[in-house]
Amino acid sequence: MLTGVYLATKKDKTVYYRSNITHKGRHISLGSFPTEVQAHQAYTAACELLSGTETIDEAFYRTNQLAFEKIVSLINFRDNHMYIPTPIYLRKNYFSYYLSIHRELKFDIDDLFYYLSLIHI
């Protein structure tokens, strides 16, 4: 099995592949994939994002390997040392919530705790 890939079986006995990564002690699921190669590509992309310097806009070309929400979460974790499973990126005095690749909402940082209370981290 390739690095970062785990075999899984659905209730109907269909085989699929899970990909995950552990970074700074945090276990992060990267998703489910139909092939081992695709799951490994997601793992490789996550490794590159977490060790690189790409901005969110520069990293969106990786959506063929990872969901854009996961890209935002990983880059936020790399840059701000806080893993948020929703597509939130912390900035100085405000944060961005990405509805899609081309749709970014900006909120005052004081509102962050409200949004975090809605999710389980």
Annotated model-derived regions:
Residues 26-37:
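A short, exposed loop/beta-hairpin motif centered on an aromatic-Gly-Thr core
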Residues 48-52:
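Sec-exported extracytoplasmic/periplasmic mature domains
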Residues 53-87:
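Intrinsically disordered, low-complexity charged/polar segments
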Residues 73-108:
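Compositionally biased low-complexity segments at domain edges in trafficked proteins
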Residues 119-121:
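Conserved small/polar residues in nucleotide/adenosyl-binding loops
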